[in-house]
A protein has these predicted regions:
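Phosphate-group recognition and catalysis centered on beta-loop-alpha active-site segments
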Residues: 1-198
Length: 198
């Protein structure tokens, strides 16, 4: 029997990945609302920016119309299918009494996302986790946000880390990055314990 490692957050956050996607279409307001009703304490989604600068929640970041697929960034919000919610619609519909994990798919979206959250409930910033793939950009975001109480994570895969995981953990901690967002198959007890040390 594998021993369960203690959580550094009590109680641990149970993020609903793209909402309750086993019971409702993923990344829809219906899926997010249902996830919270089913007991999730956090919601997770990818965030894309539209051509007119609106943060929307979707996994693939493309819209299929007929036989054509086009990136969300080429559409204005009004031209997107209705099932794709904006970040603002999520907050207006689901409130702000949960943790929020957002994977940034547009490198320049973080500031807009923080503005939306602050405009609805600035206390949610303390429970918001922004995940950025670029190591350089996540460090830049810490400099931009300074002491703003927002959590910043680098998203990567274990195989992409140059050097050892311990060096990466130390590097992130030195730059005040709150953690790392690895794929679930990359994690094991040793890595959890290692990153908890920093």
């Amino acid at each position: 029997v594998q021993q369960r490692l203690p959580s550094r957050i009590d109680p641990p956050i149970t993020f609903a990945h793209r909402g309750a996607r086993a019971h409702a279409p993923e990344n829809t307001l219906e899926a997010f609302e249902l996830a919270l009703r089913l007991g999730a304490s956090g919601l997770e989604s990818d965030v894309w920016m539209t051509a007119d600068g609106v943060a929307v929640l979707d996994h693939d970041g493309v819209v299929k119309k007929g036989l054509r697929k086009r990136p969300i960034s080429e559409y204005e919000r009004a031209d997107l299918p209705g099932h794709i919610p904006t970040l603002l619609e999520l907050l207006q519909t689901c409130g702000s009494s949960y943790s929020l994990s957002l994977d940034l798919k547009d490198p320049d979206s973080a500031e807009s996302i923080v503005e939306v959250i602050q405009g609805v409930d600035s206390t949610l910033l303390e429970r918001t986790w922004l995940c950025e793939a670029s190591l350089e950009r996540v460090i830049e975001l810490r400099e931009i946000f300074g002491d703003t109480p927002i959590r910043l994570l680098q998203t990567t895969r274990l195989e992409r880390i140059k050097g050892t995981p311990e060096r990466r953990a130390e590097y992130l901690a030195r730059h005040r990055i709150d953690g790392i967002n690895l794929h679930r198959t990359d994690w094991n007890g040793g890595l959890v314990a290692l990153f908890h040390r920093f």
